Curated annotation (Swiss-Prot):
Similarity remark: Belongs to the SepF family.
GO CC annotation: cytoplasm
Database matches in InterPro entries: Cell_div_SepF, Cell_div_SepF/SepF-rel, SepF-like_sf
Residue ranges of the TM segments: none
Gene: sepF
Cellular localization per UniProt: Cytoplasm
Tagged with keyword Zinc: no
Protein name in the entry: Cell division protein SepF
Complex and partners: Homodimer. Interacts with FtsZ.
Keyword GTP-binding: no
Example GO BP: FtsZ-dependent cytokinesis
HAMAP family: SepF
Skewed-composition ranges (Acidic residues): 21-31
Role played: Cell division protein that is part of the divisome complex and is recruited early to the Z-ring. Probably stimulates Z-ring formation, perhaps through the cross-linking of FtsZ protofilaments. Its function overlaps with FtsA.
Amino acid sequence: MGVMNKLMGFLGLENEEYIEETTTVEEEREEQESSHKRQPAISRTNNVVPFQAREKEGIRLILCEPRHYSDAQDIADNLRHRRPVVVNLHRVEKDQAKRIIDFLSGTVYALNGDIQKVGDTIFVCTPDHVDIQGTISSVLEE
């Protein structure tokens, strides 16, 4: 037991004398109420993301010029990976461009993102963590 006591003493786990404190019922209630106020909700801690991790990643903006409707899935995949996308539709026929925008609008809606028209054939699609501020007006509107 001597070796065990020395090891416990080295680790700071040696037997210590405990002093009992007497508290009143009111003090115990105050402690319980204050401890309930200090405890955060469990659901809040589940969504914690280290700030430094986001800072190192940065935001990558993707530029796309689809030529076919099938390219819309690649654009949607970028949005799913939380990357904002600028889509230039000037190389696509008008009916195909409308289908692509319809597809991307559904994707953006499902991801709680945003889509805005910034030119005649240019759209910006963003996931939920990117905000678009301001508007671009055309020369004809002025």
